[in-house]
């Protein structure tokens, strides 16, 4: 899965070369690539059910609730235990254990899991592979007041701050 994820990040649908000049390419991102990568992280189209072609197609899926198996998919990519995933999703261990017996997460839990998957996809794209991305998410970051990026992903503001740091890294700005 990690090789497939890295391939999707680097060469997925939705990325096109701008201009006809020879030499270094200038690439444009149009949204499909990130959606494909997030889908792969969460278990693929088959696991999510329905036809998901772009990010807006995920809204009804998130409202319905992601399959509880998506937690295990993401935990495996990050190298996390279910207890660590419970912490990332701001859930108690007991609540996450109950979800394992159920078919779906709640809409709120699904949204949190989606945010985590989206940040992992972005970090994988910027840093080159899933292992580096997972390590970066767990390591304290000076640009984020010396806290691990993963600890900020339980809020929308935290996610935006982490994505901003990834954007700076991507563009070569010291972070």
Where are these regions (language model features)?
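Non-transmembrane "mature" sequence context
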Residues: 3-8, 12-175
């Amino acid at each position: 899965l990690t090789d497939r994820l890295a391939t999707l990040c680097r060469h997925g649908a939705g990325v096109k070369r701008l201009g006809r000049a020879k030499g270094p390419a200038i690439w444009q991102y149009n949204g499909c690539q990130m959606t494909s990568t997030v889908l792969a992280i969460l278990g693929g189209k088959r696991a999510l059910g329905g036809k998901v072609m772009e990010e807006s197609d995920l809204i009804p899926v998130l409202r319905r609730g992601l399959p509880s198996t998506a937690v295990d998919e993401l935990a495996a990519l990050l190298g996390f235990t279910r207890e660590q995933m419970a912490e990332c999703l701001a859930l108690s261990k007991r609540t996450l254990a109950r979800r394992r017996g159920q078919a779906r997460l709640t809409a709120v839990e699904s949204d949190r899991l989606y945010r985590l998957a989206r940040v992992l996809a972005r970090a994988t794209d910027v840093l080159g592979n899933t292992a580096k991305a997972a390590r970066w998410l767990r390591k304290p970051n000076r640009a984020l007041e010396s806290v691990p990026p993963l600890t900020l992903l339980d809020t929308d503001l935290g996610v935006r701050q982490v994505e901003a740091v990834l954007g700076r890294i991507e563009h070569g700005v010291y972070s």
